[in-house]
Structures are given as C-alpha cells and as structure tokens.
Amino acid sequence: MKRCGLLGEKLGHSYSPAIHAELADYDYRLYEVAPEKLGEFLKDGEFDGLNVTIPYKKAVIPYCAALSPIAQKLQSVNVLVRRADGTLYGDNADAYGFDAMVKASGISVEGKKALVLGSGGASATVCAVLNELRARSVTVISRSGEDNYGNLDRHADAEIIVNTTPVGMYPNCGVSPVDLRQFPRLAGVLDIVYNPARTALVMQAETLGIPYMSGLYMLVAQAKRTAEVFEGHAILGSETERIWKKLGREMQNIVLIGMPGSGKSTVAARLAEALDRVALDSDAEIEERNGASCASLIERNGEAAFRALESEVIADLGRRSGMVIATGGGCVTREENYASLHQNGVIFWLRRDLDKLPREGRPLSAGDLGAMYNKRRACYERFADYSVDNNGTVEETLRQIMAVLSEGEK
C-alpha cells in the first residue's frame, strides 16, 4: 500500500485523511515536521506522496528534481511524489481546486472586476485562476500594500470578492475581513475558508442575497486532483460532488430550538444516539460553567445577565462541527446567537402545544406562556431552517428530522 499524507508544521485536526479515504486505497496520515527537520524528512522520509501545506509550499521547491508547469508558474507546491529513482516531483493542485470551486459556484468572473483579499501563498494561486477565467481585472488587497483595507473605497465597483486570508476561520469565527455593503455591485463572494462552513463573510453575502461559496469544495477538488497524481490515473469528476456533500453533512451541526419544555434535550440525546454523534446542551453547559442551575442564575442575576452567559456558551458550541445541539428556549431573543448556530448548523424548530409545556423549575415560564410565545414566535421563524411537530412520541419527531436530513443527501 502506498504511503501518503499531509506535510505541515502544525496540523491539528485535518479533514484530508477522511477525504482521501473516499478517493483511493492508500495510507494517508499527518506528518508534522519542524522547519529544521524538513530537509532530512524530504530526503529520508518513508513516503510515496504528500500534500504540502503552510508553511512549506515554497520551502519544498529546492528539494524537487522537477516541477509541473503550474507549480513552476506559481512557485508553489502542494503535491509531492517520490518517483522510482527516489527524486521528488512537485505539483500544484490548489489551482485546480479553486478553478473547480468557482465553476461549481455558478459565479461567472469573466469580464468582472475581482478583489482578492490577502497576499499570502493562496492569493497568487487565486489570482492566476481568476486571470485564466478572464476576469477584467484582479486586485490584491493586503494590510500594507498600495491597495489595502484602508482605501477600499477605491474599489467600491468590485464585482467579485475572494477571501484568501484566515480571517473568520476556526477557532476565531464570527469576524470578517470586509463589510460587503461597501460594494454595491457585487455579483459573487468566494471564501476559501472551509471551517466554519459559513464564515461571517459568507453569511453576510447570504443575508444580502449575493451568490457565494465556501472553501470545502476547493478542499475536496484539490484532494481529488492530488489522488490522481498519486495514483497515476483519472478519477470521476462526480466524486468531488459526492464527497463534498457527504463531508458537508458530517461536519454540519443539527441544532434544536423551541419553547422551554418543548423536548429539545430529550430529542437531542436520542438523535445523537441514532446518528452516532455527540449531544451538547447549552443549558447544561451554562450550569456546568457557573456551578448553578439556569433557574437560579436567572433569579439571582436577572434575565439579561443570563442571556449574556448563554451567548458565550452558544458561540463556543456553535463553532464545533458534527454535533447535535439543544439550545435554551430564549436563545432566539438574541440575534447574535443566530450567526453562532447557523455558521455550521441546520436549525430545527421543535413545536409543542403550549398546554403541554412544563412550568416547574422554569422561572420565565411561570407567567403567561401565550404572551412569551407570541413575543418569540417571529424569532423562532427567523432562526429555523425547518419546523418539526413534537406533540407526539420522540420516535415520531426523530422520523421527521431524519426525513429532512435524508432529503439533503440527494
């Protein structure tokens, strides 16, 4: 079996092994190598093929006996193959990946003015692809160059924006490199960040009705191209779409919202068990962090202080991936919680008749539940992707949710 993997200095969690397992039958592992050990590893390491990531895409070039035309042009290598004579061949699959991402997005860049945010290694690749796709002009925005974030007004006529910076990437979610409202002619936003699934930049594009795409498709497409180089034969293009959808589903959080006592925690636990996922509960997390029940925290400090604690917890839970998350009934009263939950999640509103909602141990439910519901209803509607009736059995509710999730697999 071929020995392949991902080379970098600090890798942490990577989706690459899971993607490559879908593409080919070779061993794919992570290789964390310190800069001072890079040369030794490349000369003597026992590998047949490598992906290369930060900070080594240029550093590996002197160790290559030959480069592909695209790697030579970009002076960036993210694929290494050890040839039969022991020498290294360098290639670049990032350009293929970004090109595939643009085409899958349906966003046309031909004849349009494009801004590329960031001047790092990915920026050069993106610029090359945009030029190949016949963008009218391509301008790099950096922190200190001639075109920078302080004079973006020069480019208010931009029609395409591509983010190549790590701004908004996990774990520092919720921040954006630019405010898209500065660009009234925008026709498309592309963000090569793939974790979270929707960055703050992408969510603003979504809100403004601007076509967009996140970076997961690029990651999968470049992995397909890498596997073709490793294996020496073509792989069906449809595999990119299949794996992209599969990985997207696996990374997606399933979020439950609804009135206090509507069954969110119970359904979350059963759903997590059925899907072999981890169930998280924002109320339970608040209580764990503060050493007191939610009811006592509200009674002691007031609802506003409690909501601030809740938003902190939801921000932490929402940046995780592949979880089932039960939320507190009032989380929808804070708009900031929507972004935290939506960035990685599909949101289900569990609906239960008011006369079936328990009140004991819930200080905010002690009053007029009808008034509370009427006040929150628009918020639940705003947050929810889907609405599920939870007046029957847990099994019936699970079937409704699973039916929605299954439909998304098609």
Predicted regions and their residues:
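Phosphate/diphosphate ligand-binding glycine-rich loop within oxidoreductases
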Residues: K2-S105, P196-R198, Q204, L208, ...
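Glycine-rich adenosine-cofactor-binding loop
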Residues: G8, N92-A95, V102, G111-E132, ...
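NAD(P)-binding Rossmann-fold cofactor-contacting core
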Residues: E132-Y149, D283-N290
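Rossmann-like adenosine-cofactor binding region
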Residues: D147-Y212, C331-N337
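Adenosine-phosphate binding glycine-rich loop
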Residues: I192-Q252, N390
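NTP-dependent small-molecule kinase module
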Residues: E241-R249, I254, R270, A274, ...
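ATP-dependent small-molecule kinase phosphotransfer cores
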Residues: D281-H342
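A glycine- and Lys/Arg-enriched "phosphate-lid" helix/loop adjacent to the NTP-binding pocket
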Residues: Q343-C379, Y386
